[in-house]
Amino acid sequence: LGEEIAYLKIKSFNVSNIKNDREKLHAWFKENAEKKIIIDITRNGGGTDSYWQELIVAPNINKPLESVSYYLTPFGEGTQEQLKLDGVNEGTLDSDLDKLYNLPGLNWDDLEGISGFGTTMRRVSPAFDKAVCSGPFYLLVGPNAYSSADGFAMFCKNTKFATVVGENTGGDGGGRNVCVVKLPVSGLLLRFRAMHVLNPDGSSNVESGTVPDVV
């Protein structure tokens, strides 16, 4: 790739990798502090947002960065208790769906059965007095970048931490934790998100994923 470019591929943001990867990544960023950084998450199936917030973004920024996303939810009876544990309740939801009508990509069918919408904010503060890398950063994504990997792509696009390059992600980032219910007959446990995350233009993140800056 040349002496001015450094390439890093991260296959997972699994929470169990944070401890082992923290020092490795910090050393790698210091070694390549003056280079253009390419981070490849094209086959990253996700894990936890804490991974990319603490190990990638925080060491390489000089000021706090914030990314806000909308989500829709029916706030159904079967998921209210779990959503409340995650900070979602009647007080945090806005029932005035008319406020979303100015979003050009919104599919009105997505509002059927929805009782309100809320916002999720991802805020990352600098880890050090000075960023380790001077950048710029480029994030490679594709349809296999999913969950928290998509959340990272969404964050990069919204905050300009990195230029997002590639194909649409697999989506499902930017929301809260999943809910778990027990099926009454089989007893099987079902995991799902009781919310529908929107991209900044109102389009469905679940259906479209995050659209790169450069395709």
What is the predicted role of each segment?
Residues 1-215:
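C-terminal "post-core" interaction segments
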